[in-house]
């Protein structure tokens, strides 16, 4: 059986699970675009005024760097390696393993598709 390639173009996600060291939360929305293996997203909500990520998707592995302006006025960023999963009932899910570049810490967040 051939699995359909994952495509994030036009997908909107919310943060369904946030690590204690993370900043995004259930109010954060991510708006994805994809061109070939190149993935981009803008995001915001909660304490994130605006954020962007730039990365690549090969198979189910999404790797990106992110930068965000927080409501404190600070700009922070880091890098993430993610597993993208397709769930029959709920759509796409992204399990993000992030490492901050501008502050200490790392952790795991989960994004879920809004359908």
Language model feature labels by segment:
Residues 2-31, 35, 62-115:
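Beta-sheet ligand-binding and adhesion/scaffold domains
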Residues 28-56:
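N-terminal glycine/threonine-rich, aromatic-flanked beta-hairpin/loop signature
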Residues 58-60:
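Short acidic-glycine loop/turn motifs at beta-strand connectors
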């Amino acid at each position: 059986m051939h699995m359909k390639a994952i495509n994030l173009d036009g997908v909107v996600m919310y943060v369904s699970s946030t690590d204690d060291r993370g900043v995004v939360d259930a109010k954060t929305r991510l708006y994805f675009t994809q061109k070939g293996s190149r993935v981009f997203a803008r995001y915001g909500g909660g304490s994130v005024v605006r954020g962007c990520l730039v990365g690549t998707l090969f198979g189910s592995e999404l790797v990106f760097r992110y930068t965000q302006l927080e409501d404190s006025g600070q700009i922070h960023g880091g890098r993430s390696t993610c597993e993208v999963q397709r769930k029959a009932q709920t759509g796409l899910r992204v399990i993000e393993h992030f490492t901050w570049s501008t502050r200490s810490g790392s952790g795991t967040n989960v994004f879920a598709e809004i359908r």
